[in-house]
Amino acid sequence: MSFISKCFICLLFSTYFLPPVNSAVLQVGFLAANDNTTELAPFIGWGQVAGALGVAWSRIVEYGLLPGYETMNLTWVLTNCREADAVGSVINYAEGHAHVVLGPPCVRPAQVAGSVAKYLDFPLILWGPPFDSSLLNQFEYPTIASTTSSTLYQATSLIRLLEYYKWTEIALIYYVARSDLIPRCTPLISDFEGLVNNNDNLTITYRRQMSVITNTSYATALRNLKELARVVIVCLESDEARRNLMISISENGMDGDEYVYIMAESRRAGFASSFWNGTDGKNDLALRAARKFLVMDNQKYNDTTTFVQEVRAAFSRPPFSCPNCTNIDPTVSQVGPLGDALLLYAYALNRSIATGNPNPTGTEFCEVAKGMEFLGFTGKVIINQNSTRTPLFVVYNLDSTDKEMIVMQITEDLDDSKDPVASSVNYYITLVATPAQIWDTWGGTVPLSTPICGFTGTDCPKSFTDQYLAIILGCTAAALVLIIAVISTIVFLVRSKRQEEERLNQLWQVHFSSLVKPPQKNTMHSSRSLQSTVTTSTKVTINSKKDTERHSFYFLNNDSVVARKHNFRATFTKNDRAMFRKMRNVDNDNLCKFIGLSLDSPTLISIWRYCSRGSLQDVIAKGSLQMDWFFKYSLMRDVADAIYYLHHSPIGPHGWLSSSTCLVDERWQVKVSFFGLSAIKQYEVKEQRDFLHTAPEHIRDTNLPITKEMDIYSFAIICSELITKKSAWDLENETFDIEELVYKIKKGGRSPPRPSLETEDEHNGSMSLLVRDCWNENPDQRPTSEQIKTLMKSMNHNRSSNLMDHVFNVLEQYASNLEDEVQARMKELTEEKKRSDVLLYRMLPKQVAEKLKLGQSVEPETFDCVTIFFSDVVSFTTLASRCTPLQVVNLLNDLYTTFDAIIEQHDVYKVETIGDGYLCVSGLPHRNGNEHAKEISSMSFSLLKAIKTFRVPHLPKERINIRVGLHTGPVVTGVVGMTMPRYCLFGDSVNTASRMESNGKPGRVHISTECMKFLTEVIGGYQTEPRGEVIVKGKGAVQTHWLLTDDEIEAKENGESI
């Protein structure tokens, strides 16, 4: 068939669905291969790619890229990569006023057609497989743009990767399996060799094109390569070739850490196809070699599945109308770049129209397209200065779990001042994994271009040791003897001195490894306090403590300790170490036991004995503890005794005394911590809150030495907290902040600020006077620790000095009052429980309610024979329409209250009311033998009798009447639901009873045949009257009966109508 006839047929089949050509129609030509060409169809076959144009046009319309074009007139020619057909098609399209031609998809037709397009100044957009560097020549092909990249870009990226790791000697192995119309490895290797020839630092030491891909041919190539290179560039065009190479690499022992194989791919698949898997049992060999491979491939795009689904859907619509075109493989097919090609033209035309040129020529189109960026079907599309897509290459390897991992990206530098294909310096590498991750399967080391001992292992240079070994050994032996003698003497002297020092310092040094963290419980904690948010009125075990900003908690030799953190490292003098030993030996009832320092911990810590009730600050802040005057006095006396001891001991004044450093043990005894440690305190920086307990003179000059008068001032602030049972200065209820308050304290004056001592609790006025004397602005006028101790002793008035005795007395009185309170509350609880039970028994059967109260499940229960009652108010809808909603509710309430009173006189269980409907049953949940039909019948007679006298309050002339239906049969019961549980009946008997009611008559009892037989044959004494057959929904014609009341029996006997 001639070319012209082929074009005519394609045009005939591709334009019938679109409107006539006019100024609002985008004319697009499309060149592809026929689906029956085996070597081309998987890549550029019409049935693989054409649907992408339908998807692309939908996106153009959705984004409003071409508002002036209402439709697209798409025509195509299946040139099968023939140069003549491609040239003829381009000429026909150009003369036919097409806007653009998408193709040709093959290199040689693109070169010929590109020359013709240059002459016609007509735009072509290439979308086929990567092409070689010839088409990048803008002078020769100024009207060609491309949404696929050139093999030169990948070759340049390979050069950049080699330069990055300083690999200079390389080998090439490649295998060509594809048609020379759409080659991949051949142009890539050609471009790569051209770049290497222009690079003085790189050398190709071995090159092999495989003609066959058997293990034997690979083994021959690998044996020759082994003596020439360790870095191998691989390009293979089939998974079989890839797998066989890997198996041969392992079988020939070339899968060691010194080898690296770089596989060049363009499938956007990386390792995803797991091409080492096969059926010959050699998967392990192939995988072992795969771990030494780096795969350079185009970056994958995430939305492939959705795009392919849209393409398949587009194939089923005109103009393609190919519902069977569904076998699309995006890793082989160029379906994505084809869709991007149409998007590129739409974006470029949009930009050209915006600049006033609605009909750009091919050259103008390419100029507009340069530098354009948009999100296409294959990810982000960037057009460089060659009107070609800038590729983003990624390098994959296998991690330690043999999972694919991206380790680096290689991108083009889009600096317009540079030629993007001139040199590898225009490409840069971005590592997306650490070097350790990249080279994990190589033992964590980057392979060398040339092994240290050469490719044959015989070129290792002799070391200095090998050349002069004898001389070295002799001199070393002599020197060694001399050195050993000198070192032995020095070691003996140093060791003796160190042992003495260690013996003395072992008293206060604690190895961090001996500290054991307690198991933690979930509890909130403060960042400053020793005490978490648990109550301070009870003893708190260390297990419930969590580390804070200043403190950590440990076990030391099974004893609970607390470690205060010091975020610095200090050098201690001999005097400092002597002071630590003295502190270690301190044993006072009101001082927290100093355990020592841990010098080998991550941060310097001082270790103290743990006090279970936290600090005074925590006790006061909690506010839940009832403290009478004696309790407060005892705590203040303990603090005063601690100050007295420190001021009369070698340790000296505290300097950091505050309510947070006064700890409380399980016996409610105050123990002052963080005393001494002057060598550490000089490096500590006080926070603003710490200055609230600091004497004014020290705030003004922090370089002043610590004095006893400072401790007296701090004691006064602590006492004010105990007296008022509030934090220092009660900042929580004040409007000023800490900085402002500290400034006022520092400023002083005639009336310096001091905490309030106002309290509603009982307190001793003498104590308030003592506190005011202790915080005197003039340090010289403050009392001494001896005077404080004497004055506080006089305040006790000869009462018991034991706080625990006082606490026990208070607890006994509290326990007595608590017992009375508990009895009263229990009585109230019992009454409430009775009321709850009454309400529950009204909602559920008693035996069911009892099970639910015990937490037991209520299993469904089957009852073989019960009698079910249904009733309904006659003409209730009409009656309700004449009433207000409130009147309807009152009416039903009065009616059902009357009914409920009647039910209580019979062995009947009320199941529920639904509007004006009433459902009852007898024989469950309490089984009553055969009495259920009798009970229901008697109740029915009573209800009919009661409604005769019932009156509607707001409609006194109206009369209420009901229909009644009864049925006897089996049911299943169960409790349904967790929220508002209901005791429900299930079974056909319920439906039958309902049908008896709905087919009954006002004022009469309509019963089923089963119920009639039970009343007349089992129980006896009841009279019924056949009604005849009634059409019952779901059952057809059913024989039913009337149950006669006493009045009806009498009327019947008198010959009156019922």
From Swiss-Prot:
It is a single-pass type I membrane protein. Keywords: Cell membrane, cGMP biosynthesis, Chemotaxis, Coiled coil, Glycoprotein, GTP-binding, Lyase, Membrane, Nucleotide-binding, Receptor, Signal, Transmembrane, Transmembrane helix. The keyword Cell wall biogenesis/degradation does not apply. Changing M710I: In pe922; moderate loss of chemotaxis in response to Cl-. The chain crosses the membrane at residues 471-491. Residues 811-840 form a coiled coil. Residues 501-809 form the Protein kinase domain. It comes from the Eukaryota. It is found in: Cell membrane. Residues 867-997 form the Guanylate cyclase domain. SUPFAM superfamilies: Nucleotide cyclase, Periplasmic binding protein-like I, Protein kinase-like (PK-like). Residues 492-1058 are cytoplasmic. Belongs to the adenylyl cyclase class-4/guanylyl cyclase family. The extracellular and guanylate cyclase domains are essential for chemosensory responses. The protein kinase domain is predicted to be catalytically inactive. This is Receptor-type guanylate cyclase gcy-22.
